[in-house]
Amino acid sequence: MTILRLLRKISKRFAISFQALWVILVGFWVGIAQQAEATRILIPMDQGQKDHLKSYGVAYWAISKGIEAQWLLNYRGGSFAMAHQMGLESECRLRGISYEVIAENTYAGILAEIQDPAVNMELVKLEKAPRIAVYTPPTKQPWDDAVTMALTYAEIPYDKVYDPEVLDGKLPMYDWLHLHHEDFTGQFGRFYFAYRNAAWYQAEVAEAERTALSRGFTKVSQLKSAVAQRIREFVAGGGFLFAMCSATDSYDIALSAIGLDICESMYDGDPAGPSASSRLDYNQCLAFKDFTLTPNPLEYEFSDIDVTNTRGLLTENEDFFALFDFSAKWDVVPTMLCQNHQQVIKGFMGQTTAFNKDLIKPEVL
């Protein structure tokens, strides 16, 4: 039976005009052909993207499902390309992100552009969804911390870990550890002067002291020193550590002060050790060297690593910084860290905002 005779028979049986049935059939096969050709989903990360954070979440979801994925560094803000699957396309729609379904020959053209030696772009295969841990007190809610809030919004799964989990050897369970608002020196963020009578500050101090005692330490600074050393072991074992704000400088300060008492009496009940600041061991540090501790224990500053108060006073409308344009083909990791839909970024103020370049170890990027 020919196709035409079959169509006429179907049209009579179901009271559908032959012309309408023909249009439906042609449309069906055209759709099949387009589906066969459209083999990639491109998630642009430039200004045209409706939701950048959720786009990262979709990329994570795709990798966790075993979907082939590539990160196109410096191509339209660091776009993602993935093997086309209906489930992936549905996920893109559900999360409200911008995406494009492109043909294989179109993607081949994109790859040719990226591979051009004269173009500062590179392709990175994404093969494993990292297991993420965020170092944060268990009492903190996702909206209390910018990191957990961003991950929660992006729908990227993570676990909270804190001092007990670190000391219990749980870090090797993860690929990535994130540190944010933290003080590894045992000085409780140096919030004493402004917040010593605040209920939240007193509760955090009491909880830290209970944890220290339960772990056999007489001081919180000793507890934090042990935690810092466990984190260093995690990094030495191949773990990725991403630190922000006060976690950056306070971490290296804690490593440099192993076995020393750099805390004054309002933080640990007794004065700092004699000449403790002059006995710091910078060889223990990951990133910084030759820094000087801030002598006033009531000052909201740990050391001269941070240049928040010395980089020059800027108004909010004047505070911007530009992302460095690394070589994508040679410096892949720093290029990944600088992927963004904007090159000029609005400034911000933190306890640790920017670093004194003279105090960064020469082997550090």
Question: What kind of feature is each model-predicted range?
Answer:
Residues 256, 265-267, 276-277:
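Catalytic cores of eukaryotic secretory-pathway lumenal/extracellular enzymes that build
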Residues 1-16:
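N-terminal secretory signal peptides that target proteins for export/translocation
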Residues 37-145, 154-156:
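Hydrophobic targeting/anchoring helices
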Residues 4-8, 34-39:
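Generic start-of-chain signal for non-secretory N-termini
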Residues 17-31:
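Bacterial N-terminal signal peptides
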Residues 69-75, 161-164, 266-268:
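Surface-exposed patches in mature extracellular/periplasmic domains of secreted proteins
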Residues 145, 152, 249, 260, ...:
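Catalytic beta-strand/loop cores that center a nucleophilic Ser/Cys/Thr
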Residues 40-41, 46-50, 80-90, 140-248, ...:
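Helical hinge/lid and interdomain linker segments adjacent to catalytic or ligand-binding clefts
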